Every structure is written in C-alpha cells, then in structure tokens.
Amino acid sequence: MKTQNYDESKIITLSSLEHIRLRSGMYIGRLGDGSNIDDGIYVLIKEIIDNSIDEFIMGYGNEIFIKKENNLISIRDYGRGIPLGKVIESVSVINTGAKYNDDVFQFSVGLNGVGTKAVNALSSKFLVRSTRNGKSFEALFSKGKLLESREIKSSDKDGTYVEFLADSEIFGKYSYSEDFLKRRFFHYACLNKGLIINYNDQIFESKNGLLDFLNSEIKSDDLLYDIVYYSSKTLEFAFSHTNNYGETYFSFVNGQYTNDGGTHQTGFREGFVRAINDFLKKTYSSTDIREGLVATLSVKIKDPIFESQTKNKLGNIETRGNVAKEVQKIISEILYKDKILAKLIEKKVVDNERLRKELSSVRKEARERAKKISFKIPKLKDCKFHFNDSSKQSEQTMIFLTEGDSATGSMVSCRDVYTQAIFSLRGKPQNMFEKNKSEIYKNEELYNMMVALGIEESIENLRYNKVVIATDADFDGFHIRNLLLTFFLTFFEDLILNGHMYILETPLFRVRNKKITTYCYSEEEKQKAILELKGGCEVTRFKGLGEISPNEFKGFIDINSIKLTKVDLFNIKEIKEKLGFYMGQNTPERRNFIMENLI
C-alpha cells in the first residue's frame, strides 16, 4: 500500500514531555490498570521514591512519608531538597539533574534524567515543593505543562514533597493494590538498613537488610541451614539451600529490582561455585552446587548500565568479575570459619550429584525415545526467532501452550510465524505436585514441552520470552491451567519469578449487529455492549478456543492487541502450602472450600 502525500507537513516535532505522553511505554513499560505489579502506575511511584532513597544513601534524611488517598499519591522526604532555582527544570526538562555529578550522587538508579519528568508528563496533577534553608519553592503542573509556581518562606524541614495523580487519559480506569505497594515498601526498607518508610501511618523498617528479606520469602522449615548473610558498603547478599528444584534469585542494583538478573547475578553465581569447589577441593558441576539455592543480592555501583528504561537487567561488564571475586573470597572465609555449615553444604552438593546421576539414565531413555519419534519436537509449531538468539525480535517471542487440535488450528493459521510458536497439549497433563523430577522424563508430553522451552538444564536457555498458557475459559480449561502452573511451580519456579509466565485472555462473548461487532471479556462488558448496540443484537458465548475463527483469533493474538495477564509470585514461601491445598490430597478442608465457593 502506497503512502499518499508524504511531504514536509507530515514531519512533526514533539517536545520531550509530549513524546513521553505519546510513547509512554518507552519510559515506564506497560500501562496496565494496577492489577499487575509491573503496571506503569507503580513505576510512577517508584521513580519519585528512588530520588528520596538516593538522598538517604548520600546520608540525608532517614524517613520517607508516603500517603495514598484514593489515587492521589504524595511523597515527602527530608533530604537536601532540590535547589530552589532549578525546581521547574528538574521536573520538566529531560536530561536535567544532579545525578551526572559523582560529588552529589554516587550510587543512583536514576542516572538518565527522565524519571520525575515522566511522572510529571503522565499525571493530570503534579505538584512539587522543595524546601531549603527556610524557603520553599513549589510548582503545579498538569500533563507536563506548568500552571503556576511561587517561592515562599517556610519553617518546614529541608526536603522535597511531590504529589501526583496519574492521568486517566493515559492509564484509563486504574487502582493501586495495597499488597503490591506494601511489598515494595518492605523491599525498599530491606535494601536500605536504617531507612524508615511511613505509608499511611504503617511503618516499614529493616534492621537486618537482606537477611530480613530472605526470611520473609522462605519458610524456616524449608531451609537446609541457617541463612548466610554478608554486608559491605557496595555488596550485600544472603543465601541458603532448600530441597526445591532449580535456583532462585532476587537481585538488586542501587535498590532497583533486576528480575532478569544481569552481570551482578552472573558474578554471584560464578563466585559461589568457585568458593564451594575451592573449599571442598573438588570440581563439582555448577548445577550440583547451585541446585536448590535461594539467594538475594544487592550491589551499589557507579554509572549502572541497564538494558532498558525499566532497568530489569544490568549490563555493566566489569561488575561480573568484581562481584565473582568478592563473593568467592567472602564465602570461602565463611566456610573455613563455620565447619558445620560447610558440612551441610557439602551434603547438599553430594546429594544433588547423586540425584543428577540417577536422573541421567532416565534422561537418556527419554531422549532415545524422542529420537525414534521424530528429530523435531512433536506438537510444536515453532517460530523463526527465539529469546536466546541475538535477533532484534527476541523480546517479542512467545509460545502458546494450548489444548486440542481445533484451538491449535485456529492459532496456527493466524499467528506471527516470526515470533509466535505453539505447543499443543493432548488433553489434561499429569498432576506433578510432589512428584520427582524423573517423572518428567517418563511423561512424553511434559518432556517434549520442557525441551521445546529449552529449560531442561536452566532457564538461561529459555527459547521464548513469554510462555503463554492458552486454555478454554471453562472449568476444564481452568483445570489444565492449574496443572500447568503446578508443573512449572514445582520444577521451574524461576521461570515465573523472572516474569516469563502469562495467561492469554480471550473473549467470553461476541456481541454484534449488522454493523458493529464487540468482543467482551466479562459479563459486565457484555451487558454494556448490549446496551450500546440498543437491542436487535446477536450474543455468542465462546465455550472454547476452537469456536473462535482464525480471522477473529488474529486480533486476539496480534502483538499490538493481545491481552496477557502476567503470573506473579507474591511470596515463594507460600507455594508449597497453596499447591498442597489445591493440587494435593482431597482433604476435608478442600472439600469444604469447594462446597462453600463453587456450588
């Protein structure tokens, strides 16, 4: 299709704040409605709090007061305050700030001069007030545009106050989750010992840093030994082993949670293995040493380089070696001092090695069996690009885990063959709760799915950025969804912890007349559509994905319109108990729950 009238009039120039409003995803990631912890409204809060914490790190102000009234957020710190003559520029002009100067800020996340400006641009109301030496300067903005400003005398303590209301024109209907906010504030407190966060009169404070953090994430009964903890000015970590599968990490850079890891996390993993092997004077495999390891890590570095604006993965090359060297040294010293701890870790490593060798024969049989069937993975319709290659499209790659040939057929014919793969399940997968990992290799379908994802050894080889469960919106579909989540939570929980697991949202209803067709994802949306079409309309209830035609399905899985719900783990210590209740033995408690909630 040819583009008509491409001339000078088609070239437009946007101001920095206009660009933020038009392309908000470049600055805050997804928009969302507040139902997901990664939604943009939480990023707005984070950007302001980051500035307050930067003040605390530099030794100015150990309290941050945060209030939420409906959706109006206010944040007050007692740092140095923004220089009064630069308040307006500091919150409205891109690339303006003091964090380019090491004398003022040494360990900061917000080094790009964008964060606060993005909050300003994306808020219908944005008020900033800076107080220094008995004077205050305040400025009021709306959607990034200055409405008024003034300088006044003040008896308040030095510091900065920010109040904002996220713009409903950008975010639509949204609300903040109290659980998400409190979880984040607790993390801030653990990452900054001595910092007090007062949120609506609830205090968040940590005396033991990441030790408190890891204790909140793991049940003490699951620990094979007491949590090992270390802290210095630029490196802090805590770890222990459990009997769970895989490795679990919570890593941070200058207070920023890096759920995709990065060079600091790689350095920790390498240093940990070297320390154990050096102490034991053996050459155990890294898998045997780290299987079941749960660790949290925080580093403070100058000029952090992240792989995106949302700062999920650290890219500083030199950090890997520096962290590995220090971790190896510290853990070696700890092992030499604590012989009981050393024996417990050695026992875990030896047990891991034994189990791996026992598993190897089962693996070999499964691979030989798979070779006889096909050189390709059965039931996999693969895509051209993958997450573990170096293509520009790697971030867009996804695999749909669906059930039945009819649903698969609709999706195959309308998918993007470059970035969207499909793995078709044959009925309900096996319930893997409390099963041994060897059971995967005895189950052809689960084995093929694991190989298709590339996660047999670890999720470092994950072939798709998003693993999307796409099942029917009925009880059977929900059951299959739960069985798949049980499988991943049991053997590959880090796949979910690192934000790769999603649920495909497909419409429940189609409401249409001769001119308009509306797809509805809830009973509420259906009733609204019926009212808008004013009678005489046809209502179709989709019982299964196979009932949706390929032409319709194309709109539901198109990269620009797909609706995905991210699977979040709020607290890993609750996983075993929750899975036991829903997927374990049919206890009287579960029967009562079903009677009270489903019948």
UniProtKB/Swiss-Prot annotation:
Q: Please name the CDD domains in this protein's record.
A: TopoII_Trans_DNA_gyrase (cd00822)
Q: How is the cofactor bound?
A: Binds two Mg(2+) per subunit. The magnesium ions form salt bridges with both the protein and the DNA. Can also accept other divalent metal cations, such as Mn(2+) or Ca(2+).
Q: Which PROSITE patterns match?
A: TOPOISOMERASE_II, TOPRIM
Q: Which residues are noted in the entry as Mg(2+) 1-binding?
A: 403, 472
Entries under SMART domains matching the protein? HATPase_c, TOP2c
* Binding residue positions for Mg(2+) 2: 472, 474
The reaction(s) this protein catalyses: ATP-dependent breakage, passage and rejoining of double-stranded DNA
InterPro entries, A to Z? DNA_gyrase_B_C, HATPase_C_sf, Ribosomal_Su5_D2-typ_SF, Ribsml_uS5_D2-typ_fold_subgr, Topo_IIA, Topo_IIA-like_dom_sf, Topo_IIA_B, Topo_IIA_B_C
Sequence positions that bind ATP? 6, 51, 77, 110-116, 311
Q: For site (Interaction with DNA), what residue positions does UniProt give?
A: 428, 431, 479, 590
Q: Which cofactor does it need?
A: Mg(2+); Mn(2+); Ca(2+)
- One term of GO molecular function: ATP binding
* EC code: 5.6.2.2
* Gene Ontology biological-process annotations: DNA topological change
Name the keywords, alphabetized: ATP-binding, DNA-binding, Isomerase, Magnesium, Metal-binding, Nucleotide-binding, Topoisomerase
Segments forming domain Toprim: 397-507
Please give the family membership noted in the entry. Belongs to the type II topoisomerase family.
Per UniProt, subunit arrangement is: Heterotetramer composed of ParC and ParE.
Known role: Topoisomerase IV is essential for chromosome segregation. It relaxes supercoiled DNA. Performs the decatenation events required during the replication of a circular DNA molecule.
Q: What is this protein called?
A: DNA topoisomerase 4 subunit B
Traced from the root, the source organism's taxonomic lineage reads:
Bacteria, Pseudomonadati, Spirochaetota, Spirochaetia, Spirochaetales
